[in-house]
Amino acid sequence: MICRSPLIVVMLFVIAAHTVLALEIATRIDASETESPVSAQMTRVSYRPITSVDNKRFLRQETTFEKKLGVNDVHAVHAEERSALGKAKILGRDLLWFMSILGRFLIPRIGRRGP
């Protein structure tokens, strides 16, 4: 039992790490569906004169506007989402594998008492 305790701790740590990574990837995918990519935002700077005694002063205005996504931008966003989904699937598969090992081999042996 003492020999298997470190193995169980390592297995539980790996399961927890995979779960956290899978949730992080899923959160990133959800965020990319609701927010526009940063590259699609541009800043336009314009100057307009202030009506005053001296017309030499100008006011700088920054306006952020959305740029229409081109075909390549859309493909890049979809490729990023596909790679994130692929990573999430791999993490999920590994998590199921670890849980099956834990359920099949380690948990039944923990309950048994040796002679």
Swiss-Prot record:
Induction: Expression is up-regulated at later stages of infection.
Keywords on record: Host cytoplasm, Host nucleus, Secreted, Signal, Virulence
Entry annotated with the keyword Amino-acid biosynthesis: no
Region forming the signal peptide: 1-22
Subcellular location, principal: secreted
GO cellular component, one term: host cell cytoplasm
Residue numbers covered by motif RxLR-dEER: 57-82
Coiled-coil region(s): none
Paired cysteines (S-S): none
Compartment(s) of residence: Secreted; Host cytoplasm; Host nucleus
Similarity annotation: Belongs to the RxLR effector family.
Domain topic, free-text comment: The RxLR-dEER motif acts to carry the protein into the host cell cytoplasm through binding to cell surface phosphatidylinositol-3-phosphate.
Function: Effector that acts as a broad suppressor of cell death to interrupt plant immunity. Inhibits cell death induced by cell death-inducing proteins, including the PAMP elicitor INF1 from P.infestans.
Name under which the protein is recorded: Secreted RxLR effector protein 2
Organism: Plasmopara viticola (Downy mildew of grapevine)
